Every structure is written in C-alpha cells, then in structure tokens.
Amino acid sequence: MDELEKNGLTRRDFLKATSTAAIAGALFMGDPRAVIAQAVEKKTRVVLVRDKDVLDEMGNIKPEVLERMLDQAVTTLLDENDPAAAWKRLIKPADIVGIKTNQWGHLPTPKALENAIEKRVVGAGVPEKNISIRDQGVLDDPIFVKSTALINVRPLRTHHWSGVGSLIKNYIMFSRTPWGYHDDSCADLAKVWSVPEAAGKTRLNILVVLTPLFHGIGPHHFNPEYTWPYRGLLVGLDPVAVDSTGVRLLVAKRKEYFKEDRPLNPPPKSIYMADTRHHLGTADPEKIELVRLGWEDGILI
C-alpha cells in the first residue's frame, strides 16, 4: 500500500483531484502549474436562475420578474418551497441587517433588486429601522457598524486591478484604505472579510448577471458593446463559489465573442487565493454544484 492509499485516496482520486486543481489554477491564476491536489469533498451549491422576460425590449428591468427570480434562487438554494420560510432561515427578527450593494455608475446593483431583498428581510421580521442599503460609507453607517447580518449583492464585471469585480471584492469598502489591497492583482482581497465589521456575518451572496461586462481596458473601462443580456442571477452561501462560477461565465463569453481563448487580464487571483490561502470558500469548479433554473438559451456554463 502506497502513501496515497494510506490516506484513503486512490490513484484515480488523486489524478482527478490534481487535474481539476490544474484547471482551477489555470482559470484564476493564468498559470496551469498552480496545482493543489485535494480529494473530492462535498460540493457547495450555487444557483443560476435566468428569465428571458426580466428585461424589456429597451433593456429595462421588470421588477416583478426579478423578484420572482430571487425567490426561485433562494428557495432552491435552501431546499425550501416557500420564499418567506427560506428567508426566515437566513435572517432572524433580532438581526441588524446591512445590504452591501455596489453603485459603480455604469453597472450598479439594480434598485429593483435592492427593493426585493429589503422586502424579504422585512418579511423575516426585521424592522426597517434596522436595515441599511449602501455601498460606500459602510464604516460610518451605524447599521452596518452594529450589523449582525450582511447580504452581499453586486453586478459581475471585468476590473482593471483585480480581473473581475466580484462578491469578494465588494467588501473592500470595509477597509478605510482599499488601495492597500491592489498589490499582485488584488490577490489578498479575502483578508477584508476578516475585519470585525464583516467577519462571519454574511448570510447570502448574489452576483447580478443580468447584463455582465466581459471585457475592457483601463481603470474605468466601460463599453456597452462588451455587455450582453444574460438575464440571470448567481446566488449562494459561499461567495468564493459564486465568484468562481461568475469567472467561468466571463471566460466562456470572451471565448464566444473573440473566437479564441482570451484569459482575463489581470487574472482573478483573489478568487483562487480566497480558497487556497484564506480558506473563505470553494473556488474549484469540480467542488461546486451548479443548479440551473429557467431560460437555457445561451447559458454558456
């Protein structure tokens, strides 16, 4: 019996884990040699819900459809039939709730989604006075400072410093010196999740993929040519798993658009490192259960 078998790991398991780790390394680090061999573990669930009717002919959001999508995602994530019951598992009446959004001018968190989340939090028994919705200024917001629960919600896009604007990156406003995380393609962004104002508080992560931005060059890049009406939400309890799935979506869209492999630049190291260095969650696609709901045309992943 060799060392692999002594540890309960067959050669087949080892080869599978090694190959999937290589894929993950290539995806997030831009380097297929970034390999960490791990045995297969229980998968973390991410729900992708899409609805072709969530956007009208002008690209405007239909709030009632978006609210229904949110309910479908959360009930599926938690194996519940009733949205109210699902939210009561996430949020308790005594909670003080910060809804951390993103207000980047070209692609903000939709107001309709903020409203839908707040409606469900209130429905779980939280008074409106104990809820705050904001992006910047969270460290000066008394609700966020005293919060017992956070909901993390932002759109998916490419990003000049970190490769992707992600759920992990969305908490950078919990630092008074966010520029301090820019080194090495923002590889250690997950550190900010350990500050007292954020640590252990996140109940739900929602990555908005209604009209993601899949390409751009420069610090403030935005060209609507590089967005597309994907009409979806990615939802999970694990921010790393949701972000990892978002990266897969962007990579697939870039390949479809450019007709060749076009890696994200810079590579989204922060997502891989959030798993392997900071142990915030799971980045390996082989360890993620992706549940797909709704519209299937052009799903890409």
Regions found by a protein language model. Name each.
Residues 1-301:
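N-terminal and secondary-structure boundary signal
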